[in-house]
């Protein structure tokens, strides 16, 4: 895999990871932090897209009312929204989503599709899933069974 930065320069292999945001149900969040604390902490390592503030991220994730609660008190669906948010709002050109709708209810799945449409237009988006509703907007698909 090779990639170029925004100026067209080749990104060295050992720096490619810096261009990637990832969300997966098995990745942990710091549950002792409130949502705002966690997003602020994340932003120090992985800045969010320009013109995006923490309050608006909470609102767009449907979690504004819970922004001052510790994440340990979130449902599994709320935690998945946080994981998706930290990846999708990141100022990274590559987004990897593994089973992105795990633990999401119908409202959360619709939110997921809205966020994809809004936040990934100029990004390489890779979704790993066997669930049709998670990949319904994908233009290209790679079926791993074709390579066994």
Q: Residues of each region from the PLM?
A:
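Conserved catalytic loops of ABC-family nucleotide-binding domains
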Residues: 115-135
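Helix N-cap at the start of a conserved alpha-helix in ABC-type nucleotide-binding domains
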Residues: 106-107
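Hydrophobic anchor residue at the start of the ABC signature
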Residues: 84
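Conserved ABC ATPase "signature" region
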Residues: 51-66
